[in-house]
Structure formats: C-alpha cells, structure tokens
Amino acid sequence: SRRPARLSQPALEVLAIIAYYQPATRAYVDQIRGVDSSYTVSLLLERDLIEECGRLAVPGRPIQYRTTQTFLRSFGLSNLDELPELPNTTPEDGQLTLEMQAAVERLQAAQAAEGTEEVTEEELLQAAREMAQAEEEA
C-alpha cells in the first residue's frame, strides 16, 4: 500500500486547529490563521483526516468539521482525550503568531531531516505544545 504523503505546513496548521477546537468552521480556522483555508480544508477532507459534522446555527449555516478515525489512526491515538491539554484553548487574536508559525516550521524541518513520509504523534504533539505556549505568551 502507498504511504501517505507528508502534510504541508498549512495542512498541519489547519489539522491542529480542527483537532483542538473541533467542531470548527472554515471561517474559524481562517480567523485563527489569518488566511483563506478553503483549499487546505478540501485537501484534508480528501485525505479523510477531517469530516463534516453538521452546521452551525447562525446565518449562512456554515459547515462544521471534526477529525476522523483516520486522523486518530494516522497519529497512533485511540481517542481525542489522548491529545495533550493545551494551556490556553482560546486563541486571543485572528492570526497565528510568529512563534506558532516557527513551531510548525520546526515540525516540517524535523520531518524532512528524518525523511519520514508521515507526521509522528510526537511531532504533532510537540508542535501543538509549542503553538499553545506561543498563544499563552501572545
């Protein structure tokens, strides 16, 4: 069987946001990242790492997304409770801080250095911890 391709920086950012703040709308993801995430959300849907899980009861009824069993299997998790707790679970502003972007870049560099095709659970968790720490310091 073909090994899944490595996730890009935007895909890791979107996946981390949805994993920790689910159910999340694309507009919410866009607000946190500060850029349009339509393409990345569709890519994660194609890879079955996220799925639609209803609509938000506000005008326009935006689609909400959550992670899938494929996401859990890909990162060696039994359930979402195994994700480490984030110290601050409410982003204060609509942009990823430079520190958060740097955390994801370090994750990408570690992937490239190891020549791995998949993100390991520890890499995802480390990036999430660094993102949370950056949020707290912001």
Predicted regions and their residues:
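Basic, flexible Lys/Arg- and Gly-enriched helix-loop patches that mediate nucleic-acid binding at interfaces
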Residues: 1-9, 32-33, 38
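Short amphipathic alpha-helical interface segments
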Residues: 3-23
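Alpha-helix C-caps/helix-loop-beta hinges
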Residues: 21, 47-48
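Short acidic, hydrophobic short linear motifs in intrinsically disordered regions
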Residues: 21-32
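Short amphipathic alpha-helical interaction segments
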Residues: 32-46, 59-62
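A short, conserved structural fragment
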Residues: 48-57
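Basic, amphipathic "hinge/linker" alpha-helix immediately C-terminal to the N-terminal HTH DNA-binding motif
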Residues: 64-74
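Phosphate-centric recognition/catalysis
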Residues: 73-138
